[in-house]
Amino acid sequence: MSKIYDVIVLGAGPSGLTAGLYAGRSRLSTLIIEKGQDGGQIAITNEIENYPGQQLEGESGPSLIARMTEQAKKFGAERVSDVIKSVELTGDVKKLIGNKGEYLAKTVIIATGAFPRPIGCKKIGRASCR
C-alpha cells in the first residue's frame, strides 16, 4: 500500500514550493510533485527585482528557486518528478495517479502555475520568442 501523505503539492514553482515548505515546517508529511524543472515561469527570469518580503537586487530566477527548493527539503518536504494523469479528490484520502505510480494524501494543493498560451493569430509563431 502507498504511503498516505498529509499534504501533496502539485507544482514546484514559487507557490508550490512555498506551500511545501510551510507544510513541512508544520511537521506534516509532504510530497511535492513536479512534471518538469522546479521554478515554473520564474526559472526563466534573468533578474528578479520584486519579490514579496525580500530584497533581491540582481538575483536570478534559478538561484531563488534553488534556495526555495533547498528550504522545502530542509523542512522535510519530499519531491518527485512525475506527470499526474488523473485525480480522485473525493473522500478522506485523495488519490493521484501518475506515470510513475499512485500517490495518496489527506490534502492536495494544486499550484500548477502559469504557462504561455497561443492567442490564435496565424503568424504568432514568428514573433512569440522575441
Identify the meaning behind each predicted range:
Residues D6, K35-Q37, S63-I65, I109:
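Short low-complexity stretches enriched in small and charged residues
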Residues A43-E102:
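N-terminal Rossmann-like dinucleotide/flavin-binding domain of flavoprotein oxidoreductases
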Residues G13:
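Glycine-rich NAD(P) Rossmann-fold beta1-alpha1 loop
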Residues G16-L17:
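N-terminal Rossmann-fold NAD(P) dinucleotide-binding loop
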Residues M1-L10, S26, A77-R130:
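FAD-binding core/adjacent interface of flavoenzyme oxidoreductases
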Residues I8-L10, G24-I44:
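Glycine-rich FAD pyrophosphate-binding loop
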Residues D38, I44-N50, F115-G120:
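Glycine-rich, flexible loop/turn motifs
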